[in-house]
């Protein structure tokens, strides 16, 4: 049974890698990244993160916070703050891309 989980994980990783390669080769990955940047700016997500970073620096003091500390502390919250509408839009774009690739 342990092999099944390992095999599935390996297949999932191979699938992710193949999809990522297609996204990169077609230029779709850059388009999706740009769309994500725009949507996150539109919804105020970036401003929320800036504010969270400022609060952490204020609480701990500039001398006691590194960029790595900020990234580690902010990343889980940042992911939670991405609006569901943005997640759904990107997921739909990826699905559409994969459907188009399957028809090629």
UniProtKB/Swiss-Prot annotation:
Gene3D superfamilies: 1.10.246.140. Residues 1-14 have a biased composition (Basic and acidic residues). It holds the Pfam family EnY2. One of its GO terms (cellular component) is DUBm complex. Keywords: Activator, Chromatin regulator, mRNA transport, Nucleus, Protein transport, Transcription, Transcription regulation, Translocation, Transport. It comes from the Eukaryota. The keyword Protein transport applies. GO terms for molecular function: chromatin binding; transcription coactivator activity. It is found in: Nucleus, Nucleoplasm. Residues 1-22 are annotated as: Disordered. GO terms for biological process: chromatin organization; poly(A)+ mRNA export from nucleus; positive regulation of DNA-templated transcription; protein transport; regulation of transcription by RNA polymerase II; transcription elongation by RNA polymerase II. Component of the nuclear pore complex (NPC)-associated TREX-2 complex (transcription and export complex 2). Component of the SAGA transcription coactivator-HAT complex. Within the SAGA complex, participates in a subcomplex of SAGA called the DUB module (deubiquitination module). Belongs to the ENY2 family. Involved in mRNA export coupled transcription activation by association with both the TREX-2 and the SAGA complexes. The transcription regulatory histone acetylation (HAT) complex SAGA is a multiprotein complex that activates transcription by remodeling chromatin and mediating histone acetylation and deubiquitination. Within the SAGA complex, participates in a subcomplex that specifically deubiquitinates histones. The SAGA complex is recruited to specific gene promoters by activators, where it is required for transcription. This is Transcription and mRNA export factor ENY2. The gene is ENY2.
